[in-house]
Curated annotation (Swiss-Prot):
InterPro entries according to UniProt: Oligpept_transpt, OPT
Transmembrane segments: 44-64, 68-88, 125-145, 152-172, 211-231, 252-272, 283-303, 359-379, 414-434, 442-462, 525-545, 596-616, 644-664, 677-697
Subcellular location: Membrane
Family named by the database record: Belongs to the oligopeptide OPT transporter (TC 2.A.67.1) family.
Keywords: Membrane, Peptide transport, Protein transport, Transmembrane, Transmembrane helix, Transport
Membrane topology classification: Multi-pass membrane protein
Gene Ontology MF annotations: oligopeptide transmembrane transporter activity
Protein species of origin: Arabidopsis thaliana
Protein name: Oligopeptide transporter 2
Keyword flag Transmembrane helix: yes
Gene: OPT2
Tissue expression per record: Expressed in flowers, leaves, roots, and stems.
Induction cue: Highly induced by iron deficiency.
Length: 734
């Protein structure tokens, strides 16, 4: 198999003024603009608001399920194209005048600028790629895991302010990382490519629209089987079936609770969960994920569990995100939380230290290494280029796209500063007057805001030039865990206001660059993003509130009926993180008072690793494969595990290799024409079938769980411990 290299973008500051200095931009983005195209249309508002509300609802709704589904902006990009054209055909062209203002429901053909703004609405509804507002997870763990109360008002303020705060940081940094041509934002270039493909004249026998409809119908019809009639299709773990009484065999073969050897799925929600659609991931990235996954799952974990019994691994399941006590039983979190939402030291000392499954512990160590290696890797391999690009971005010379954007009124700075001030004031109100509900003191908010402002500049520059976004969340968790131990909600709130608001800022900036390339009036972008964010956040928390108050025992896997979909795997990991970093604190987990201080050495490993790769590249410059070693990706490959499982990775890698290597190499024209359309159709089909099944069958209690194929993957022993004397329901005692 031939190696596929990712080349650094060629930047030439001496190019002609009518060309971008970045080669990828020159090849993809049009140098022309038509300012007469209407953007503030009824079609844009109707389809944009509808898309925002639908995606907010669906992503929040499916986020609580065992196999969460995230519907992205790409689905809306494809679906709204025929809808926009249909509205252009059927809406009346009558013009209405109100004073000097003229309005029409149908000002002309549906155009690409309307389409871009609709997609920005949808991107807000999709949580800018995360599915739902991150702060919703805080409400989830308060109500479902800690069994405490929080008001809807406090929840709404928390969700909205953490989103809008990021918008304020984005406004401050916009001139530095959006306008300069050297800040080229690779993912925005990808979106431009898709928009241009969708709006090109299509006279082929199998148009993209027709292909989408066919794939959508097939996806819609098929999903009833893995979602309702034949649940085993979500994880076909045949090794468990061959060895129904062997714990070791089921640990090896389970796709949900084990190493997943031979496990696969015929369910798109399993394939696209956690890692996103493999159809839109570059092959180079897939190979890095594959190598990292194999190293961790099939080398490190077996040696740690069976070979060395690291951290008393045999007392616990081989793959679990749960927290345990020394006897291998589930840790009773509720007993160590007092009525002030703080750590009850007396009960904690009685119950003892917190233990993690070996996989969960090692995944934290790998996460430490991945964070540091990201910064080291970028400094060594991209530092010189980034510095040159930052220096170039301060020059007065503008590229063709920035000059074309000068035709439109810019966004006044006070718009951003006003939003920033309002969100900070509301956040302070939350911290001062509703402190009992969120625990975070006012100084915590100010410190988190300072960290966000500090990190937004370097991280956004790294993302804009290298397409790598360092994950700095553990830094905020670690810091607050040390400053204010024993307060779990304060810890997650600090992380959300600090790291997540910075992450939101980067998402906003990415959308701004897309609008920059597509020549969208800046004020239109601002209003669409702001309105979409407020609507999406409101829908997110409303749907979450409904599910949390209406689904009995939601997120409580041990109390739910067998095969219930409401297990909230992502919230379980989020809850465990709040316990580790907030309630118990880093000192009692990873410090001298805990079981895992040795994991701190992974920080050093992450620091040294990229240096070794860099030295190897310098020593052997002709060995091109060395330059393709990307330790942040290799180490971060398993960052989604848990809650992602081995069957998710198995299927994602297989499908990704098929489409982004074989199909891309041997059927490139098909890939260019239909690959993204197929991904969007698969997402949309199962999403609509999932909602239909819930409202027509699940809500009415209609199930068919009496037969073998409706009982999941049938690996009941995969989660059993193998240490002598450990008692777990349903497991043999050694």
């Amino acid at each position: 198999m031939a190696a596929i290299e990712l080349h650094k973008p060629e930047i030439n500051a001496d190019d002609d003024d009518d060309e971008s200095p970045v080669e990828q931009v020159r090849l993809t983005v049009s140098n022309h603009d038509d300012p007469s195209l209407p953007v503030w249309t009824f079609r844009m508002w109707f389809l944009g608001l509808l898309s925002c509300i639908l995606l907010s609802f669906l992503n929040t709704f499916f986020g609580y399920r065992t196999q969460p589904l995230m519907i992205t902006m790409i689905s809306v990009q494809v679906v709204t194209l025929p809808l926009g054209k249909l509205m252009a055909r059927v809406l009346p062209e009558t013009k209405y005048k109100i004073g000097s203002w003229e309005f029409s429901f149908n000002p002309g053909p549906f155009n690409v600028k309307e389409h871009v703004l609709i997609s920005m609405f949808a991107n807000a509804g999709a949580g800018f790629g995360s599915g739902t507002a991150y702060a919703v997870g805080i409400v989830d763990i308060i109500m479902a895991f800690y069994k405490r109360k929080i008001s809807f008002l406090a929840s709404w303020i928390l969700v909205i302010t953490t989103q809008i705060l990021g918008y304020g940081w984005a406004g401050i940094m916009r001139k530095l990382v959006v306008d300069p041509a050297q800040m080229w934002w690779p993912t925005s270039v990808l979106q431009v490519s898709l928009f241009r493909a969708l709006h090109e004249k299509d006279n082929a026998r199998m148009s993209r629209g027709k292909f989408f409809v066919i794939a959508f119908v097939c996806s819609f019809a098929w999903y009833i089987f893995p979602a309702y009639l034949f649940l085993t299709l979500s994880s076909i773990s045949w090794v468990c079936w061959a060895f129904p009484k062997s714990i070791t065999a089921q640990q090896l073969g389970s796709g949900m609770s084990g190493l997943g050897i031979g496990a696969f799925a015929l369910d798109w929600s399993v394939i696209a969960s956690y890692l996103g659609s493999p159809l839109v991931t570059p092959f180079f990235a897939i190979v890095n994920v594959l190598v990292g996954y194999v190293l961790v799952m099939y080398m490190v974990i077996p040696i740690s569990y069976w070979g060395m019994n690291v951290y008393e691994a045999n007392k616990f399941p081989i793959f679990s995100s749960d927290l345990f006590d020394k006897q291998g039983q589930l840790y009773n979190i509720s007993t160590i939380v007092n009525n002030k939402f703080e750590l009850d030291m007396e009960n904690y000392q009685q119950q003892g230290r917190v233990y993690l499954s070996t996989f969960f512990a090692i995944s934290y160590g790998i996460g430490f290494a991945a964070i540091v290696s990201t910064l080291t890797h970028v400094a060594l391999f991209n530092g010189k280029g980034i510095w040159q690009q930052v220096r170039a971005s301060t020059k007065a010379k503008m590229d063709i796209h920035t000059r074309l954007m000068k035709k439109y009124k810019d966004i006044p700075g006070w718009w951003f500063y006003s939003l920033l001030a309002i969100s900070l004031v509301l956040s302070l109100v939350l911290c001062i007057f509703m402190k009992d509900e969120i625990q975070m003191p006012w100084w915590g908010l100010l410190l988190a805001s300072f960290m966000a402002l500090t990190f937004t500049v370097p991280v956004s520059i790294i993302t804009a030039t290298t397409n790598q976004t360092p994950g700095l969340n553990i830094i905020t968790e670690y810091l607050m865990g040390v400053l204010l131990p024993g307060r779990p909600i304060a810890n997650v709130c600090f992380k959300t206001y600090g790291y997540i608001s910075m992450s939101q800022a980067i998402s906003f900036l990415n959308d701004f660059k897309l609008g920059h390339y597509m020549k969208i009036p800046p004020r239109s972008m601002f209003l669409v993003q702001f309105i979409g964010t407020v609507i999406a956040g409101t829908v997110n928390i409303s749907v979450a509130w409904y599910l949390l108050t209406s689904v009995e025992n939601i997120c409580q896997k041990e109390l739910l009926p067998p095969n219930s979909p409401w297990t909230c795997p992502s919230d379980r990991v989020f809850f465990d993180a709040s316990v580790i970093w907030g309630l118990v604190g880093p000192k009692r987990i990873f410090g001298r008072l805990g079981n895992y201080p040795a994991l701190n050495w992974f920080f050093l490993g992450g620091l040294i690793g990229p240096v070794l790769v860099w030295l190897l590249q310098k020593a052997f410059p002709t060995k091109t494969w060395i330059s393709q070693i990307n330790l942040p990706v290799l180490l971060g490959a398993t960052a989604a595990m848990p809650p992602a499982t081995s069957v998710n990775f198995n299927c994602w890698i297989i499908v990704g290799v098929i489409f982004n290597y074989f199909v891309f190499k041997y059927c490139k024209k098909w890939w260019q024409r239909y690959n993204y359309v197929l991904s969007a159709a698969l997402d949309a089909g199962l999403a609509f079938m999932g909602v239909l099944l819930y409202f027509s069958l699940t809500m009415n209690g209609i199930s068919i769980n009496h037969w073998w194929g409706a009982k999941g993957e049938n690996c009941p022993l995969a989660s059993c411990p193998t240490a002598p004397g450990v008692l777990v329901d349903g497991c043999p005692v050694f």
